[in-house]
Regions:
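Bacterial Sec-type N-terminal signal peptides, specifically the leucine/valine-rich hydrophobic h-region
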Residues: 4-7
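Exported/periplasmic ABC-transporter solute-binding proteins
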Residues: 10-39, 44, 58, 62-66, ...
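Short acidic/histidine-rich motifs immediately flanking catalytic phosphotransfer sites
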Residues: 68-70
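Active-site-adjacent helical/loop segments in soluble small-molecule enzymes
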Residues: 100
């Protein structure tokens, strides 16, 4: 019996493939896209599991700076990506998508046909924007208002949000009369309407960047996922949700 047990112990048994979980912090505007990308990537890469959190790109940058356990980032801001690179906290940054800024209002509001952006803002009593210090969409909105010489006039009306999805929810709920969000966010909601598309000349280019966190011990797996965001499969999903192709 002992001999049989010994022989059995010596037999080769197939070892189950080891899986590695990587944690990615992504801009809030990417959540629905990531919900589609995640199962597609994990099916193609069965040894890699993905874990995500979502928020404003500035807050994600601050979490990386404070040493949070993050392997990679997907940011809606070149400024935040460049800041991490300059501090040697991130590497291998790559642009993977673009977007547009729009002004939205609740769907049940009168159409206000013919009103330009300045008139729409003047008509609103509360305007939701992401906090410009931590939310790229809010920074783009502030740049727009400043370039139109409207920021000082409209500043008292601004309701600051922690990320672009909170801006969307404020307008949906009627807690703000108007709000600046990305085109992709507006497309997701049946409760809002796009009142104006913002001229791209009024703000910095809107582009999304991936980057590896330098102190991650899972760089190979992280690189595999970040590279996947530039593949045709991931780009088709981004396009489905209204994102523009990377330049």
């Amino acid at each position: 019996c002992g001999l049989l047990l010994l022989l059995g112990a010596c037999e080769d048994t197939p070892e189950k493939a080891k899986t590695t979980t990587i944690h990615i912090s992504a801009a809030a505007s990417l959540k629905d896209t990531i919900d589609d990308v995640k199962p597609l990537f994990e099916k193609a890469n069965p040894t890699i599991k993905l874990s995500f959190d979502f928020g404003g790109s500035g807050l994600i940058r601050e979490r990386v700076e404070s040493g949070a356990p993050i392997d990679g980032v997907l940011l809606a801001s070149k400024k935040d990506a460049d800041t991490l690179i300059k501090q040697n906290l991130a590497e291998k940054t790559k642009e993977f998508a673009g977007n547009e800024l729009v002004l939205i209002e609740p769907k049940n509001v009168d159409q206000k046909a013919g009103m330009n952006l300045e008139q729409l803002l003047n008509d609103a009593s509360k305007i939701a924007i992401g906090d410009p210090e931590s939310v790229p969409a809010g920074a783009y909105a502030k740049q727009t208002l400043e370039n139109l010489n409207l920021y000082n006039a409209e500043k008292a009306k601004l309701v600051l949000a922690t990320d672009v999805r909170q801006v969307l929810s404020y307008v949906e709920a009627g807690n703000a009369d108007a709000g600046f969000v990305y085109q992709t966010d507006a497309l997701l909601s049946k409760k809002v309407q796009v009142k104006a598309k913002i001229d791209e000349k009024l703000h910095d280019p809107i582009a999304y960047y991936s980057a590896q966190v330098s102190d991650s011990d899972k760089k190979e797996e992280t690189a595999t996922f970040l590279d996947f965001m530039n593949t045709s499969e991931a780009q088709k999903i981004l396009e489905k949700y209204g994102f523009k192709a990377a330049n």
